[in-house]
Regions:
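Surface-exposed intrinsically disordered loops and tails
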Residues: 85-103, 191-195, 242-269
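Serine-esterase "nucleophile elbow" of acetyl-processing enzymes
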Residues: 29-86, 125
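Structural recognition of the beta-strand scaffold that forms the well-ordered cores
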Residues: 36-41, 45-47, 69-74, 123-128, ...
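Short amphipathic alpha-helices and their capping/turn segments at secondary-structure boundaries
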Residues: 24-35, 60-64, 104-125, 159-171, ...
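Histidine-centered active-site loop/cap adjacent to the catalytic His
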Residues: 254-297
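Oxyanion-hole/transition-state-stabilizing segment in secreted/luminal serine hydrolases
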Residues: 92-150, 182
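Secretory targeting and sorting signals
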Residues: 1-29
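Substrate-gating cap/lid alpha-helix
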Residues: 153-155, 185-234
Length: 297
């Protein structure tokens, strides 16, 4: 049998057909909806740093390492109550990456509307909230009872928040809450180094507050909606012994957990509760690790 050889004109015609078919596929891919990463919370969720305002924080790290498209509803100063009830964000931070404004509605309602409109295209929800509920307790004569009262509100409000997010996003979207570094440990060196005995006592009490009250309440609230909590407090070493010390260039010999919080936050240097860039990066790494542990099951 003789083999038929296609004429050059026929080869060109086939090539033209393939070329015409390809743009259709590319156009379909171009119009495909992205998969979104939705962030809610307080100033930690928008990466606040003193003298810098909003920075990439942990959310940009998470978006980059998951391949998801960030949409950030975070609001500086938010509490577990205001995230549910306050209309608008009175402390809008300029330059928030992928930030969303919602002047006529609450943070949760704005997020719910987005989740509902893009249901089926949500890959991850993260929340950092609760820190502002307990910050004032550090100045109280009896901090632990103050934290106990605040924790009751945290538990109730975050349970409602998580349930609302779950209802809007659907049953399979990972919801990951995050806690905070225990910045009060920085009281060992700020504002006075060495600290007064009362300051050391406050720092010790702060570990108890996070470990036994605040973080368990947050964890229970997120788990109630099929979510989970990454314990940033534990990851930054707050639960380890304060009798172990390390010699630092800036502060001399201090407990290891204190050195950790000094490196990861601004508290020891400025008395500011927010994370430094390495602190936000650590939070991002914890969330990414949890995200993949959940989605690859």
């Amino acid at each position: 049998m003789r083999r038929r050889i296609l004429a050059p004109s026929a080869l060109l015609a086939v090539a033209a057909l393939l070329t015409v078919a390809a743009p259709g596929t590319a156009a379909q891919a171009a119009t495909r909806s992205p998969t979104y990463y939705v962030s809610l919370g307080d100033s930690y969720s928008v990466g606040f740093q003193p003298n810098a305002g909003s920075t990439p924080g942990y959310t940009v790290y998470v978006a980059r390492h998951t391949g998801l498209t960030l949409v950030n509803f975070g609001c500086g100063g938010a509490t577990t109550s205001s995230i549910l009830t306050l209309v608008g964000c009175p402390d809008v931070l300029p330059h928030t990456v992928s930030g969303v404004t919602y002047p006529t509605t609450t943070q949760i309602a704005a997020a719910q509307a987005f989740l509902t409109a893009h249901r089926g295209h949500i890959g991850l929800i993260t929340v950092t909230i609760g820190g502002n509920d307990v910050t004032a307790c550090a100045t109280q004569a009896s901090p632990i009872p103050c934290v106990g009262t605040a924790v009751n509100s945290i538990k109730t409000n975050v349970t409602t928040l998580a349930a609302d997010l779950r209802a809007a996003a659907g049953p399979k979207v990972p919801i990951i809450g995050s806690t905070y570094p225990d910045v009060i440990l920085g009281s060992y060196v700020w504002p006075h180094n060495p600290p007064a005995a009362s300051t050391v006592n406050l720092a010790n009490l702060s570990v108890t507050a996070f470990k036994l009250l605040i973080n368990p309440a947050l964890s229970k609230a997120y788990v109630s909606a099929g979510g989970s909590l990454v314990d940033v407090t534990a990851a930054t070493g707050a639960y380890t012994s304060l009798t172990r010390t390390v010699n630092t260039k800036t502060y001399g010999t201090i407990p290891v957990p204190v050195a950790s919080v000094c490196a990861l936050t601004w508290f020891c240097a400025l008395g500011n509760i927010h994370a430094r860039t390495p602190g936000y990066t650590l939070i991002g790494k914890l969330i990414v690790a949890r995200y993949y542990s959940v989605t690859r099951r």
